[in-house]
From Swiss-Prot:
Record key words, sorted: DNA recombination, DNA-binding, Transcription, Transcription regulation, Translation regulation
Entries under NCBIfam families matching the protein: hip, PRK00199.1
Name the record gives this protein: Integration host factor subunit beta
Protein family (similarity comment): Belongs to the bacterial histone-like protein family.
Record-linked InterPro entries: Hist_DNA-bd (IPR000119), Histone-like_DNA-bd_CS (IPR020816), IHF-like_DNA-bd_dom_sf (IPR010992), IHF_beta (IPR005685)
PANTHER family tied to this protein: DNA-BINDING PROTEIN HU (PTHR33175), INTEGRATION HOST FACTOR SUBUNIT BETA (PTHR33175:SF5)
Function: This protein is one of the two subunits of integration host factor, a specific DNA-binding protein that functions in genetic recombination as well as in transcriptional and translational control. Involved in hydrogenase gene expression.
Subunit description: Heterodimer of an alpha and a beta chain.
GO biological process, one term: regulation of translation
Pfam families in the cross-refs: Bac_DNA_binding
Length: 95
């Protein structure tokens, strides 16, 4: 599912809301999650999961084509840990 499909589905299930309003809400939610993560904050949605940022230390990598060693800089990467409700649902648990 892509963002536009999510917006259409939410608008369909909530006929009292205009699609443009749903789009603003969804975009605001994503933007707030991004802003929080950019500050280094953790965003927890109970039952669904938690978004956080993990630091990957600098390391020496290898160019797969040439086999030469390459320095890989330290970087911060997004991380998502699933919540129990989501894991249970994916594994055939309660609906």
């Amino acid at each position: 599912m892509i963002r536009s499909e999510l917006i259409a589905k939410i608008a369909e299930e909530n006929p009292h809301l205009f699609q443009r309003d749903v789009e603003k809400i969804v975009n605001t939610i994503f933007e707030e999650i991004i802003e929080a993560m950019a500050r280094g904050d953790r965003v927890e949605l109970r039952g669904f999961g938690a978004f956080s940022v993990k630091k990957r230390d600098a390391r020496t990598g290898r160019n797969p084509r040439t086999g030469t060693s390459v320095a890989v800089d330290e970087k911060h990467v997004p991380f998502f840990k699933t919540g129990k409700l989501l894991r249970d649902r994916l594994n055939g648990g309660e609906e």
